[in-house]
Amino acid sequence: VPARRPGGGAPAGACAAGLLTGCGGSSSGSASGAASSGSGSSYTILYDSQPATLNYLTTGTDLEMVVGANCVDTLVEYDNKGVMREGLATSWDWDVDTLTWTFHLREENWVDCNGEVVAPVTAQDFVDALKYVLTPDYAASNVGLVTAYIAGADDYYSYHVYLNNANTGVVDDDGTTYTVDGSGVVTVTAPDSDPATYAPVDFDAVGVTAVDDHTLTYTLTYDFPGFLSLLCYLPYEPAYGPLLEETGDQFATSAETTYSCGAFYLAAYESLETWVMKKNPENYDADNVFIDTISRIYNAEASVNGPEMIKRGEIDEATIGSDILDSWLSDDTTKDMVSMDRPNTNYTYFYMFNFMPFSHEFSNWSVEGMDAEYEPENWAKAINNTNFRKSFLYGINNSVTLAVKAPEGYDNYKLNTITPPSFCANADGVDYLKCGDLANITEFFDEAKAKEYRDASIPELTAAGVTFPIKVQMPYNPSSTDWDKQCQVFKQQLEGVLNDGFDFIDIIITAGPSDSFLSSVRRNGKFAFLQCNWGADYSDPQTETDPFYQAEGARGSRYAFLRTGVEDGFITGDTADAVMNYMKAIEEAVEITDDINARYDAFANAEASLINNALVVPMGMSVPNYLATRLNYWEGQYASTGFSNKRLKGIHVLDHYISMSEYEANRDAR
């Protein structure tokens, strides 16, 4: 453990925005410390998509969790083979009688954006962070990962949602009202129901406790087998309590409002300019951090400029897109500079229909819906038809789309389910994909069946007032390598099947914004059909339901708004039944906590029903990008869940770009 400086070296707000201007400058802490990489190594990369936030306690998106992954340590972590090991906790114990995990913490410090020690990390920092996540005002996207598993968390969070509704005069779409009396009791009055009252719930009722500075306990709602894996994810990270209290919703909006206790600290962040993380010499494991400075430089044309800068040796990594891959591999000067990213097995891709193409006001989110030019009313009628959706399910050839990013071996990435193989197994060691009705799912692509479903849907759609061709708006993020090309081959392939003999659909490809794409497009309902992805947060099939499940009246994870379309009354009949049966199946599966086999079968049956009713169309696993990189990613942390794969701890910056043969040797040697 590095020698500790005295704790409390700076007040909570000494580095707050507007109070200190030196953050991000030269840091005395980065020039010396407990360990050095020996070569003063740096790692520079371009980025072309602006994160909407750096707040690791509230975000859930890929780019925005980089700071949480690299600058804040977790209780446990993983090695490069996926084996769990000590993190901020040196040991932990489970008491099945009280459903309580106890963690014993090591000595560690918080540092500011200059690398200067602020205070020691204590168990209270985990408590304060969890309270922040459970505060409705901050709209934490991962709050469900806390309310589902920590005793008392759901009651606490729900009460404060109702209290906020009462204080702000919220009236739900169905007419439900909220009032609060002088003692804090909230009354919720729904139409045709007796009023329900909710007494105040203090945070002391939530099952997280700082027993002392170095002892932390979590009390669970049930014996949840995936809890330890959940700890290596955003909502269970610590945060310095006094900083949270001072900054509130401005926490982690800049380098100045972010404290770090991980392998790196956030030294500078300027929107649309630069993003710098430096090695944290105070970290307990600094000897295993081999990069001194990580610099991300904003460049709106990174996909074009990055490879050219690689040729000049100006940056350390760039994605080699499919449009230039062949030329790089055939050129003697670049062929040995091309390798691949490490496969990320926890991400899967699938297509979502927009079941709520109109504007809608949730209590904590506004959806604009599809633009009029894409005929949202026509689309709403179309997706209410099961045969229409099944024509997509059976008509899409995922091999064609996957081949854009994986010219060789693309079938290795194809999936017919949402959950990937080898994700988890039941108590008998049976892979989850072999449980329940998932065991019966096979390849869907079948042109003849697709046309049968199309032909069956045409008279039904015509009777419902649908006009042809049906406009299918399909957006993509221009900052995502090859997504535009995938959309183009998708359009050509599916229209080639479904428009054979009838002008059935018109897939309209649109470019979304590079910045805040998810908030502007998917979460805003501005699409008809969209390629989406999901990364598992922990090792239990419940995590794979997050993109699809919505509680009554809730916004959910803002993917397809399945339940909202039913609640708003334009998703009806068989489709509404399929949606609500899925929601009920998930609610029942969640309640099975004493029989893992029964639990997994229940979730598997629900996932199978989601797919077989064509409420979602599976696509495949994440295809690793072709890269020119100086990093050996096989040295880095790995896990099939959470954000471990984003951590750069343990990775060296080499003096050359890695070739494919070296990549394969590194993979085999890990």
What do these predicted ranges mean?
Residues 85, 278, 379-498, 605, ...:
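Append "and occasionally in soluble cytosolic enzymes with long acidic Gly/Pro-rich linkers
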